[in-house]
Design a protein with these regions (language model features):
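Long extracytoplasmic/lumenal interhelical loops at the membrane interface
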Residues: 41-105
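Hydrophobic transmembrane alpha-helices and their immediate junctions
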Residues: 104-144, 168
Length: 181
């Protein structure tokens, strides 16, 4: 009964995290090869220059498990350089947080970032306060994750604080189920 449903919810929460991580790697590969740009352009979606700037970024990273990244703020410096040498008219960001994290932190960094946001935090909320807290966490993170694909929202204050404050508010009114450690 109840225990089985609770266990099923916990599995669903972890499966959701794994699914997002997998999607991000597939998406990153499609961005790297240009396949996502060709697909979206073929169906008439105006990428508003995203495809162009993503293609410029390609020279600065390798899609490989051995790629360790260029460091924090490397993407901002890269885009500024594109502007300075006249490749772009406006120094706007990549509009792709997944690509940004990969270029800056590399394969291990993106793996850690995904594991923390999509596995460790939901696991903690679920183990400490029950599956409803984990479900709420993903109810917030799922739509945000969609914006990570073509926008710059992963590090906005309002996104990151909302992602943490709403589950935290639920936890303040819930009794801990058990110690997650």
């Amino acid at each position: 009964g109840v225990l089985r449903r609770s266990h099923a919810k916990e599995k669903l929460i972890m499966l959701t995290g794994v699914a997002w991580g997998t999607l991000f790697w597939v998406y990153l590969y499609l961005v790297h090869t240009g396949a996502i740009s060709r697909l979206l352009n073929a169906v008439g979606i105006n990428m508003m220059g995203r495809d162009y700037i993503w293609s410029l970024a390609k020279d600065y990273y390798q899609f490989s498990p051995t790629f360790i990244g260029l460091g924090f703020e490397a993407v901002d410096a890269m885009v500024t350089r594109f502007y300075e040498i006249g490749l772009i008219d406006v120094a706007y960001p990549l509009h792709n947080d997944i690509l940004k994290v990969f270029v800056e932190l590399g394969f291990p960094g993106l793996c850690f970032w995904c594991a923390f946001l999509y596995l460790i935090l939901p696991w903690y909320w679920t183990k400490r306060y029950g599956p409803e807290a984990g479900i709420l966490y993903f109810a917030i993170l799922n739509p945000l994750s969609m914006t990570y694909l073509t926008d710059n929202t992963a590090f906005y204050f309002w996104c990151t604080m909302g992602l943490r404050m709403i589950p935290l508010a639920v936890c303040c009114f819930a009794k801990p189920t058990k110690d997650p450690a």
